[in-house]
Amino acid sequence: MDKPSDDELVAAVASGDEAACRALMDRHLARMLALARRMLGNHADAEEVAQEVFLRVWTHAERWEPGKAQFGTWLHRVATNLCLDRLRRRRGTEDIDAIPEPASGEPGPDRQLEQRELAARVEAALQRLPERQRAAIVLSHYQDLGNIEAADILGVTVEAVESLLSRARRQLRVALATEKDELLRSREINA
């Protein structure tokens, strides 16, 4: 038996079907959490955004127009906009450079430490990017969306997404190269 499509589930949610809403959450929650965590830099804020995304699904399901866009694209747009709103509100009031826990791996302790340090440096550099560039990188590289879909989510042209990605990649390269040089110099001094 085929699983119901997102459009079918949203129609059921519009009729008050809680099980359909849970099914949509089961299907999309992990990606919304990952997107929000990368955008916001911490898990607690990401969980709040993900909850708000699905609260909006519940409260606005009757407005969904099947065929106008993919449901997943709409969810990404809602999550991205909520993240951008949250970043704008906290600008100047909170340190955006807080580094969340990095991904773990199976290699030995030394390699795990190196991987965590690299992940932390990349995450810190990502958090220093301007909001729109960060959103473009997160959608493209971490959410594996194409430029057309990212453009739709961000409400810009494909060319604008390509420009945002180009500038973001350049800034990340410069930030990480500068940090690498500083790290090497500090190791030479301490050696």
Q: Which residue ranges define each predicted feature?
A:
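Arg/Lys-rich amphipathic alpha helix in sigma70-family domain 2
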Residues: 59-66, 77-97, 115
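Helix-turn-helix DNA-binding module
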Residues: 123-135, 139-160
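C-terminal edge and immediately downstream basic/flexible tail or linker adjoining helix-turn-helix-like DNA-binding
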Residues: 116, 124, 152-159, 169-191
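Short, charged helix-capping/linker segments at alpha-helix termini
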Residues: 2, 14-23, 33-52, 158, ...
